[in-house]
Swiss-Prot record:
It comes from Salinispora arenicola (strain CNS-205). Keywords: Ribonucleoprotein, Ribosomal protein. NCBIfam families: PRK00595.1 (NF001860), rpmG_bact (TIGR01023). Pfam families: Ribosomal_L33. This is Large ribosomal subunit protein bL33A.
């Protein structure tokens, strides 16, 4: 069972293009205490957009 205080929790990255496409990744809470923002490819929008951490 995963603990709530896990150092590397699984986070869901949701597209800011409004397509509803998501990536699932893990992040290190010690290095990235804020919400994660990555620029990745959205296949529905067919371009690179910002993906923000959704909670």
């Amino acid at each position: 069972m995963a603990r709530q205080t896990d150092v590397r929790p699984i986070v869901r990255l949701r597209s800011t293009a409004g397509t509803g496409y998501t990536y699932v990744t893990r992040k290190n809470r010690r290095n990235d205490p804020d919400r994660l923002v990555l620029r990745k490819y959205d296949p529905i929008a067919r371009r690179h957009v910002e993906f923000r951490e959704a909670r």
